[in-house]
Amino acid sequence: MDVVWLYGSRAKGTEQPNSDFDLAVAFHSFPDDDWELRLQPELLAQSWSDQLGLADGIISVVDINHIPIQLAMGIVLKGETITVKNTLRLIREEHRITSMWELDHLHHRRHYG
């Protein structure tokens, strides 16, 4: 993992005692197999839950590169960066997400008012 963000209620400070931990990850390596790529965040969440002795579903992990751009933009703007192993990757992800969001926003504005 190069970057990890905390988002959702725990990042906003509105969590309840039973709230989950929503985490977005910029992975360092990517499996070649599509199925393994899709499972990568879920397997990481399960591994962390097992290591910490937490119930299933308490940790939720998404791959920042494979989520809707609106969610990614919300994570970048309102989430907290909690781990940065590669600062350049953080900057690139923030730039990529912001650029994609701007293109999407301009497209919708141009075509739908």
Name the predicted role of every residue range.
Residues 7-9:
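Glycine-rich beta-strand-to-loop/alpha-helix junction loops that act as flexible
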